[in-house]
Amino acid sequence: MKWFFTFASVVVLLDQFTKKLAVLFLRDRGTVTIIPDWLKLTYAENNGIAFGVEFASQAIMILLVGSISLMIALYVLKSGNRKTLFLLPFSLIFGGGIGNLIDRLTVGRVIDFIHFDLYQGTIMGSWVSLWPIFNVADSAITIGACMLILLHNRIFPEPDTKAENHVR
């Protein structure tokens, strides 16, 4: 469990540090362009979840994120699996959840600032922005979830049926 919490702590510290920098340098400045027409830093406060979707009050969001984080930690603890390939994706998701939970508890919403400007304009008469503004915690959650999907067979290998058949 030491590595699980170590990885998660790194995510939380990096997330909170970058959010403090965003508050300090971006909140009153607007947008800072890093790579023209592609990457910007834009301060935003998000009351919802992914893509700004709001579906519940902050109290319910805090309860939901806290419960999911607790379930992840308990699952990893009870699994007994201490392989890095197993711990890393769960610690990224856990750390990202805790990072955003800290924002909800202290600020009342999540601070976002990384903005990929893939396309902004009108489609069929409606203004659209094809990529949300996000943060380090969101990135960690997404990377952890992608690892679980893409590496599923390596993280959760099937039991060797040949070995089981020989035991009988």
Swiss-Prot record:
Family stated for the protein in its record: Belongs to the peptidase A8 family.
Sequence intervals crossing the membrane: 57-77, 85-105, 130-150
PROSITE patterns for this protein: SPASE_II (PS00855)
EC number: 3.4.23.36
Leading EC class: hydrolase
GO molecular function list: aspartic-type endopeptidase activity
NCBIfam families the UniProt entry points to: lspA (TIGR00077), PRK14787.1 (NF011368)
Cited function: This protein specifically catalyzes the removal of signal peptides from prolipoproteins.
Pathway annotation: Protein modification; lipoprotein biosynthesis (signal peptide cleavage)
Catalytic activities: Release of signal peptides from bacterial membrane prolipoproteins. Hydrolyzes -Xaa-Yaa-Zaa-|-(S,diacylglyceryl)Cys-, in which Xaa is hydrophobic (preferably Leu), and Yaa (Ala or Ser) and Zaa (Gly or Ala) have small, neutral side chains
Designated name of the protein: Lipoprotein signal peptidase
Record keyword Magnesium present: no
A Pfam family it matches: Peptidase_A8
Residues annotated as the enzyme's active site: 112, 138
GO cellular component term of the entry, any: plasma membrane
Keyword Cell membrane tagged: yes
One GO term of the biological process aspect: proteolysis
Topology in membrane: Multi-pass membrane protein
Annotated localization: Cell inner membrane
Alphabetic keyword roster: Aspartyl protease, Cell inner membrane, Cell membrane, Hydrolase, Membrane, Protease, Transmembrane, Transmembrane helix
